[in-house]
């Protein structure tokens, strides 16, 4: 059974996620910051739910606990390789980290598609 404080923290994190997503599409730069914060909050949420300390998670993926703190606060972006390691450690799919974005159907592209042309395998380049 989870400690009551953990449940409160998870509820607070969920509320923070909702507030962040309400700020989506202000600007591309802001979206990147919001994206980083959402991923960090997802990390904090799963860590609390699973009952791990920041130190335990950091040791598992070979980084410092201070880096975990920065990830959770949205101060640093998580490298792809570390997201993969975290996915394995917590036994979650890779898209867990952006689930709130996917669930809210938020998009990144603001340009219209006719301004780009296909290169290969759905990779597009601006005209």
Q: PLM features: residue spans?
A:
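Short alpha-helical DNA-recognition segment
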Residues: 51-70
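Short basic helix-loop element that most often maps to the first helix and adjoining turn
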Residues: 3, 12, 41-56, 85
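Short, charged recognition helix plus adjacent turn
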Residues: 7-12, 99-127
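A short, Lys/Arg-rich alpha-helix, primarily the initiator
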Residues: 24-49
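Short, conserved catalytic or interaction motifs in soluble domains
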Residues: 73
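General nucleic-acid-binding
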Residues: 1-24
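DNA major-groove recognition helix of helix-turn-helix/homeodomain DNA-binding modules
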Residues: 81-96
């Amino acid at each position: 059974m989870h400690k009551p404080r953990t449940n409160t923290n998870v509820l607070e994190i969920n509320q923070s996620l909702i507030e962040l997503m309400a700020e989506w599409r202000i600007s591309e730069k802001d979206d990147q910051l919001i994206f980083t914060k959402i991923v960090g909050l997802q990390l904090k949420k799963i860590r609390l739910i699973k009952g791990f300390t920041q130190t335990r998670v950091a040791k598992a993926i070979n980084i410092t606990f201070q880096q975990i703190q920065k990830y959770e606060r949205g101060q640093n972006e998580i490298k792809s390789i570390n997201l993969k390691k975290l996915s394995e450690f917590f036994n979650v799919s890779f898209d867990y980290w952006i689930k709130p974005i996917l669930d809210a159907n938020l998009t990144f592209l603001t340009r219209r598609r006719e301004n780009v042309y296909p290169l290969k395998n759905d990779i597009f380049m601006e005209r």
